[in-house]
Curated annotation (Swiss-Prot):
Name this polypeptide is given: Ribosomal protein L11 methyltransferase
Location of this chain's protein in the cell: Cytoplasm
GO biological process: methylation
Catalytic activity, as annotated: L-lysyl-[protein] + 3 S-adenosyl-L-methionine = N(6),N(6),N(6)-trimethyl-L-lysyl-[protein] + 3 S-adenosyl-L-homocysteine + 3 H(+)
Keywords noted in UniProt: Cytoplasm, Methyltransferase, S-adenosyl-L-methionine, Transferase
Length: 299
């Protein structure tokens, strides 16, 4: 019997994309597609028909509108319909093509070949039901920050271990290994993210002893790391900051994104309280990435 899914479509301002992603993920949506249409984004998420009712979907619409309007954005539009599993599993792939990021990386869908003249490091990716295709500003900011932290232009990179907290599809952890890190931890509270990360590691020829994947959060990082990357929403970053001294070496670096511009000061203040010094803030549209260094244990 063919399983049927609710296809939930949200049209909103591009700046509200991450908020909608987070709400869809919290609701239980397992796959997403994003299209840009005349300055607005169309985001589609999918959830099994038997898991939710029409009343649940109506409530989701209310939550999304509250989230988006509270940040000062225009009211989003919500539409839903029933589709067969095979239909949604393949339809969104048509909208995703190889994407160059930074100076050295190319994100390439697993079902496509990179350009013949490509000279970049290729990250093969099939996000499946997890979040993270590399198209969003916050992901690209994190990838560019990883390029900076793992740069080997002037001297070889010493053995480096990183942790990707909230790994989604595993794109950031995988990129760090391709850029020269020796080992990476990838953790996420979603079992779908764990599965997607493991699959993407195989696609990129990464061994299980290079990429340690666990379901959970920071507590699953079993050694002190040289750097940590967190591309998650600001409230979650603030929640886990007090725990990071347990896993980050003194003078270790941190890349923090998923942060709206008007949230940056609040996150920066919490970083300072937890013993981090802020090096730079990178901005792209309404999103930013904070690059920091861990200086001391908090008082």
């Amino acid at each position: 019997m063919v399983q049927r899914w609710w296809e939930i479509t949200v049209t909103c301002q591009a700046e509200a994309e991450e908020l909608v992603y987070w709400r869809l993920q919290s609701f239980g949506c397992q796959g997403t597609a994003t299209q840009l249409q005349q300055g607005r984004v169309l985001i589609q998420g999918y959830v099994p028909q038997q898991r939710v009712s029409l009343l649940d979907i109506a409530a989701l619409g209310v939550w999304i509108e509250q989230d988006v309007v509270a940040q000062g954005y225009l009211s989003p539009k919500l539409h839903w319909q029933l589709v067969n599993e095979q239909d949604w599993a393949h339809s969104w792939q048509a909208y995703w093509h190889p994407i160059p990021v930074g100076d050295r990386l190319l994100i390439c869908p697993a079902w496509e070949m990179p350009p013949l003249d490509n000279t970049r490091l290729v990250i093969k990716l099939d996000p499946g039901m997890a979040f993270g295709t590399g198209t969003h500003e916050t992901t690209q900011l994190c990838l560019e920050a990883l390029e900076m932290q793992l740069d080997q232009t002037f001297e070889p990179l010493p053995p480096t271990v990183i942790a990707d907290i909230g790994c989604g599809s595993g794109i950031l952890a995988i990129a760090s290994l391709l850029l020269g890190a020796q080992k990476a931890y990838a953790v996420d509270t979603s079992d779908l993210a764990v599965t997607a990360t493991q699959r993407n590691a195989e696609l990129n020829g990464i061994r299980a002893d290079q990429l340690i994947v666990h379901q959970g959060s920071w507590e699953q990082v079993l050694e002190l790391v040289d750097g940590v990357v967190c591309n998650i929403l600001a409230p979650v970053i603030i929640e886990i900051l007090p725990h990071l001294p347990a896993i980050v070496k003194p003078k270790g670096w941190g890349i923090f994104s998923g942060i709206l511009l008007d949230q940056a000061d609040r996150v920066a203040e919490q970083l300072k309280r937890q013993g981090w010094s802020l090096g730079s803030v990178w901005r792209r549209n309404e999103w930013c990435c904070l690059n920091a260094r861990f200086e001391r244990l908090p008082d």
